[in-house]
Every structure is written in structure tokens, then in C-alpha cells.
Amino acid sequence: MNIKIIGSGSYIPEIKVTNQDFHKHMFLNEDGTPLTHSTEVIIGKFKSITGIEERRYADENLLTSDIAAIAAENAIIDAKIDRESIDYIILAHNFGDVKHGKIQADTVPSLATRVKNKLRIKNPKCVAY
């Protein structure tokens, strides 16, 4: 069996939250008391330790399977292939879809199976793991 990756895709959420957005936040110790350093100092230390200046958040209406399907669609376009020629969909994840505001995961069917459906792949030989 020959295996090769011929395309890749990704999804980068549009909602940006920069370190500056945290200036309005109060940072607390484990016991709930405020940290003694200023917010500016805390944010500066966080950046110097992690290198993170901004993070991205997905829209609250998007599920994990939606995000994965967008990335998969981009990979199909990048590879210039017919989606029906895909042999396997492998989605490495240990949790299912979780709707915004909920704590219960929806794990069945698997995320890979949901992605196959969202990609409208009809080929029964395309196995979703």
C-alpha cells in the first residue's frame, strides 16, 4: 500500500483576541484573590514566556466537525482531486462536537463520519476513522 499526502488544508478562525484585549480583565490567584502585579505586567510576562500576541476563536455556531470539514474542503481543493477518490478520512480527536453553551459532547457518529457527510462524499469505500 502506498500512502502519500498530496494536499493540505486548514481553517483559521476570524475572531481575533489580542493581548491588549485582556487589559480590562482581572487576573486572580488560585484562591480567588487578585494578583499583585498590574494587568500590563501580567500580559507582558505571558507574552515573554509564550510568545503569544493574539489568539483566534471560532464562531460560537461552528462545531468541531464544521471546522474540520472546512479544512478538509481546502485540502481537497489544494490537492486538485475528486472527493470521491478519497480512501480514508482520519480525524485525530478524542472528543465529539460540543454545541456552544453545552457541556455534553455528541460523540456518535464519529467526527470523521460527520466530515465525510459534510463533504458530501458518497463513496462507500471511503472509510472515516
Language-model features, listed with the residues they occupy:
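N-terminal amphipathic/basic leader segments beginning at the initiator methionine
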Residues: 1-41
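Beta-strand segments within the central parallel beta-sheet cores of soluble alpha/beta enzyme folds
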Residues: 5, 46, 85-93, 126-129
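Generic secondary-structure signature for well-ordered alpha-helical cores
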Residues: 10, 51, 77-81, 91, ...
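Surface-exposed, flexible loop/turn segments at secondary-structure boundaries
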Residues: 13, 94-97
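Conserved catalytic cysteine-centered active-site region
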Residues: 39-65, 96-129
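Short glycine-rich, polar/acidic loop-and-turn segments at beta strand-coil junctions
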Residues: 61, 72, 90-95
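Aromatic/hydrophobic pocket-lining residues that form the small-molecule binding cavity
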Residues: 68
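Phosphate/pyrophosphate-binding loops at sites that engage ATP/ADP/AMP, CoA/4′-phosphopantetheine
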Residues: 71-87
